[in-house]
Amino acid sequence: MSIPVNPNSFKGSFLFTSESVGEGHPDKIADQVSDAVLDACLAEDPLSKVACETATKTGMIMVFGEITTKAHLDYQKIIRNAVKDIGYDDSAKGFDYKTCNVLVAIEQQSPDIAQGLHYEKALEELGAGDQGIMFGYATDETPELLPLTLLLAHQLNANMAKARRDGSLPWLRPDTKTQVTIEYEHDGGAVVPKKVKTVVVSAQHSEDITTEELRKEILEKIIKTTIPAKYLDEDTVFHIQPSGLFIIGGPQGDAGLTGRKIIVDTYGGWGAHGGGAFSGKDYSKVDRSAAYLARWIAKSLVTAGLVRRCLVQLSYAIGVAEPLSIFVEDYGTSAEGRTSDQLVEIIRKNFDMRPGVIVQELDLAKPIYFQTAKNGHFTNQEFAWEKPKKLNL
């Protein structure tokens, strides 16, 4: 059954805000390093079992966790290359891949957990790596079927990284943060973005630019080239570098940990979140693989025209292949008045939700994860879970 919907709650307009962080944010550094280690394992051994966490602070990165793999890993090289890719390549930026201290505390996975996964069985019968709840969300407000608040916040960070790399804004450093507030109108249970009310941008920078000049450059070269003009007007508020100087950033400014940006990684506060982080986890961890599946399901339902906006919940138990429950919230947007139960039946008919099948259908045994840790896990439309499945109704 569906959550009871009050039709009066789907009237009028409202403001909603989402945030994002750039590649050089300390927590995002940790996510990317964890996924770089995961990719290195999967590149040599697709059956690797990885639970890799990362912590970083001034001049230091530590990776720790449980890994069972046949791959021969050079942790120093993997970690330093990830930091280099992010852009911390000089001590003047507050962090340098060449000189940072790299600590490794990796052990093998618990044999008790391995037993629960039933490795001796066929991949299709692989049990879930843990219990948990996972959510997927999709909305027809953008072609990507993502919330516009989050999409714009991600794009602002991505475009700052591009401007830093191509030299058009050479004073930029990797640590950036963005936040976008949009005024929406209800359209039944769907939501329609009307205009951007507020944009917040904070960007780490070198010492050779003034705050006044930085604000001008960010506004003209990043914000106005990223956000479509139709969403901006004379009332749009821009908070660019609201704290003033932002020279000390990255791990020198704040400690970073894997899994601290789970809302940035997913739907920017829309929908719901089961609480499990993604980065550093292989496909047997349903925190990740089933969340990708739930997104695939939600996006497929919207693409098929069955709903305009939906939230999908899945739940699993360790060692059990089939999900324990499936839930769909359509926010009152279901075409032809389909009930939640009917939508669940369509899901069961079209998707095999066992972890061992998910990995095959979504190509999750490949070393693809480093890129997912940048600017959201659902923004890159080349990933398999972003390509809607044609449904048999």
From Swiss-Prot:
Catalytic activity field: L-methionine + ATP + H2O = S-adenosyl-L-methionine + phosphate + diphosphate
A Pfam family of this chain: S-AdoMet_synt_N
EC numbers on record: 2.5.1.6
UniProt binding sites for L-methionine: E66, Q109, D254, K285
GO biological process, one term: S-adenosylmethionine biosynthetic process
Residues that coordinate or bind Mg(2+): E19
Key words of the record: ATP-binding, Magnesium, Metal-binding, Nucleotide-binding, One-carbon metabolism, Potassium, Transferase
Necessary cofactors: Mg(2+); K(+)
InterPro entries according to UniProt: ADOMET_SYNTHASE_CS, S-AdoMet_synt_C, S-AdoMet_synt_central, S-AdoMet_synt_N, S-AdoMet_synthetase, S-AdoMet_synthetase_sfam
Any GO MF annotation of the entry: methionine adenosyltransferase activity
Cofactor note: Binds 2 magnesium ions per subunit. The magnesium ions interact primarily with the substrate.
Pathway the protein acts in: Amino-acid biosynthesis; S-adenosyl-L-methionine biosynthesis; S-adenosyl-L-methionine from L-methionine: step 1/1
Binding residue positions for K(+): E53
Annotated positions binding ATP: H25, D175, T176, K177, S243, G244, L245, F246, D254, R260, K261, A277, K281, K285
Family under the similarity heading: Belongs to the AdoMet synthase family.
Annotated function: Catalyzes the formation of S-adenosylmethionine from methionine and ATP. The reaction comprises two steps that are both catalyzed by the same enzyme: formation of S-adenosylmethionine (AdoMet) and triphosphate, and subsequent hydrolysis of the triphosphate.
Entry protein name: S-adenosylmethionine synthase
